[in-house]
Amino acid sequence: LNPAFIPKKAEDLGFESIWYHEHPILPVTSESPFPATGGEIPWTYGHFSEPYISLAMAAAVTSKIKLATGITLVPERNPLILAKEVSVLDLHSQGRFIFGVGAGWNREETTMMGGDFDHRWTQTREAVEALKELWTKDEAEYHGRYYDFPPVYCNPKPVQKPHPPVLLGGNAKNVLQRVARWGDGWLPNRATPGQIEESRKILEALEAERGRDPGSLTISVFGQSPDTSRPVSYT
């Protein structure tokens, strides 16, 4: 699908945002079960567009619709390059980018792309910490287990301050705690309205516990089933 046509049509129809997934490769042989079914991985997962190139095309033909990754596979990317990609996309879209992040579920893919699958959320957290330094500091540096670099310049900076919103994807056991610690929102995958309601209560408690503004952590539901009656139940 043309990434210039679809976003423009979505904006004309009044949609709030458009999201691009990421899987740069899909192993021919994989022992990682597909999360939605626990079984075979759909063949479409080997045909995803590149999200940042697609969103750049979308930015060029739109002016209002928000542009988002749902999600960026952070352990598979170099944060020094990713920081620039996000900043430039946010700049040229006049602050419309939403940075949805995830750690991945396919062991073989993550490993081939240089990620540490068994500790992928720790690696993701470090990368996001490094990205925030690069986005907000004139001279940025980071020293961690997975990423370690001396002071560097990384310009331009994002339009959104202090940086584009960082939304954590998935339904991992500790995802809400992670959102409260170093995220700006949650991207639940295939969640029911009841689960969303209960999770909102937990997020509100975590906001208070960590001194964050009430209601500052967002929830954006994605990856839902094609049941057309389902969206009504969220309203």
Regions found by a protein language model. Give the residues of each.
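Active-site-adjacent structural elements that line small-molecule/cofactor binding pockets in enzymes
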Residues: 1-234
